[in-house]
Amino acid sequence: VLIMPGIGYTVDRPLLYWAAQALAADGWFVDRLDLKLTEDVEFPEMIACMERVVDQWRAEALEHAAESGEEARLLVVTKSLSTLSYPHSAKLGLRVVLLTPVLNPPPFDKHKSIIPAPLPGAVGSPMPLICAGDADPYFDDAKAHLLTDHVRTFAGANHSIEVPDDWRTSLDYLKQVTQAIVD
């Protein structure tokens, strides 16, 4: 599994950290793309970089599987900015988790980058799992349902799938997201 970060949301933040822990406990080999991204990143350049990372990771995982005689288990877990690499992963036929996908453009991205919905050329690729909060300004439930039937929306949750001033609900959501990824 390849774990990919978002802007200000590194792989050691709760959603990605616990996804990695749960998947490792479930027998997955976990690779993490450890980037420190800020709002001044050039979205098209970063998306292209992430697509190259996916290509390299996929090639290495397939090579390892062939050498070991094991079946390749390929899954990409993305968060926020890295969800914009989904169209590329879908074309490769990869299973993908989209945590807080960018379906509405962030105001700081002059390129207005979003995941197109519906996604052209995704026929035949596995439907992604989408998890997001309904208080996330970059999430759009209708667009999400154009991409997949596997949409988990969390009431009152923000772009981190957390509910401000409600740690109990935030932890419950974290558990639900982690479980959905493992399932």
Indicate residue ranges for each PLM-predicted region:
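Conserved alpha/beta-hydrolase "acid-adjacent" motif
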Residues: 107, 137-143
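Primarily recognizes the serine-hydrolase "nucleophile elbow" in alpha/beta-hydrolase
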Residues: 54-127
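Acidic catalytic loop of the alpha/beta-hydrolase fold
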Residues: 134-139, 159-160
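Serine-hydrolase catalytic machinery in alpha/beta-hydrolase-like enzymes
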Residues: 1-71, 163
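Active-site nucleophile loop of the alpha/beta-hydrolase fold
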Residues: 7, 35, 97-106, 133-135
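Short beta-strand/loop motif that positions the catalytic acidic residue
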Residues: 124, 130-132, 136
